[in-house]
Amino acid sequence: MSRIGRLPITIPAGVDVTIDGDRVSVKGPKGPKGQLEHSLPTPITATLEEGQVTVARPDDERESRSLHGLTRTLISNMVEGVTNGFSKQLEVVGTGYRVQAKGQDLEFDLGYSHPVPVKVSQGITFTVEGNRVTVAGIDKQQQVGETAANIRKLRRPDPYKGKGVYAGEQIRRKAGKK
């Protein structure tokens, strides 16, 4: 049995979990769109009993074992997302590098000949404080992490000067010419 998969997911107050066949829906207090859905993989089943969701698998095949822990973690992240939400912080570092909020979207000046716009996707909010950008939302695995990764990809950290967009990372600096 998977060590992660066998743990039950406790449902906090104010969160409504619905299991309909192979679909798991989670509704919560986080915003008007505080609902997430997940389709269960074929061999995996989920049951709702006494305020807890339990994920089970029918056999010990390799694919079933790997999907067991994954499914339990995805459902747990959905419950966490609709109650507290997720956020990632990014920092813009470099001379002349800046970020500005244009309505709900962002505009980066990253040393290119043109400003780089970033459109907000549905369910994501941006907060700009100086050179820090906070990406927040309820869907961890897709929206928040992917949006933060796409913003970081605009200007990856430079190993020589440490300039770029990154999130609290320790940049491994290289020595320049001698």
Curated annotation (Swiss-Prot):
Record key words, sorted: Ribonucleoprotein, Ribosomal protein, RNA-binding, rRNA-binding
Gene Ontology CC, one term: cytosolic large ribosomal subunit
InterPro entries on file: Ribosomal_uL6-like, Ribosomal_uL6-like_a/b-dom_sf, Ribosomal_uL6_a/b-dom, Ribosomal_uL6_bac-type, Ribosomal_uL6_CS
Matching SUPFAM superfamilies: Ribosomal protein L6
GO biological process, alphabetically ordered: cytoplasmic translation
Gene Ontology MF annotations: rRNA binding; structural constituent of ribosome
Free-text function comment from the UniProt entry: This protein binds to the 23S rRNA, and is important in its secondary structure. It is located near the subunit interface in the base of the L7/L12 stalk, and near the tRNA binding site of the peptidyltransferase center.
Quaternary structure, from the entry: Part of the 50S ribosomal subunit.
Family statement drawn from the similarity comment of this UniProt entry: Belongs to the universal ribosomal protein uL6 family.
Name listed for the protein in its UniProt record: Large ribosomal subunit protein uL6
Annotated source species: Micrococcus luteus
UniProt lineage: Bacteria, Bacillati, Actinomycetota, Actinomycetes, Micrococcales
